[in-house]
Amino acid sequence: MAIDGILKQGFITTSADKFINWAKTGSMWPMTFGLACCAVEMMHAGAARYDLDQFGIIFRPSPRQSDLMIVAGTLCNKMGPALRKVYDQMPEPRWVVSMGSCANGGGYYHYSYSVVRGCDRIVPVDVYVPGCPPTAEALVYGLLQMQNKIRLTNTIAR
């Protein structure tokens, strides 16, 4: 958090935008939308070795409790409406991370008749994590980039 000034009385001065965004980055609660092998790497990133809890990232089972969705794997045409429905159930503000080549653009199954060529055709995506499947380190890096993006947004409308 960018601190504008520290007064001698023990007060810290900063803008409301910076404070609110700092609080949001320290408490991102993702909902997993694992569709294929990328979900295994997503579970690996949530295990003890990478410990996403240290970044304030705690996986939630319900879309109503989460503010971040991680779409991991091949998205089929039949799964598209379900993805949109789950996204619409999330409270505002909400963000989406697309994990893996299949979620980013169809991947290996790009030319199949039943595969959506990128989950950004269904929901707006904020961060893309490349790879087939991406490593747990790549997902952690993508989540840190998501935190940086949240820090730079304007929370209070001007």
Curated annotation (Swiss-Prot):
It catalyses: a quinone + NADH + 5 H(+)(in) = a quinol + NAD(+) + 4 H(+)(out). Its cofactor is [4Fe-4S] cluster. It is a peripheral membrane protein. GO terms for biological process: aerobic respiration; electron transport coupled proton transport. Binds 1 [4Fe-4S] cluster. One of its GO terms (molecular function) is NADH dehydrogenase (ubiquinone) activity. InterPro entries: NADH_UbQ_OxRdtase-like_20kDa, NADH_UQ_OxRdtase_20Kd_su. The keyword Zinc does not apply. Pfam families: Oxidored_q6. Its main location: membrane. NDH-1 is composed of 14 different subunits. Subunits NuoB, C, D, E, F, and G constitute the peripheral sector of the complex. This is NADH-quinone oxidoreductase subunit B.
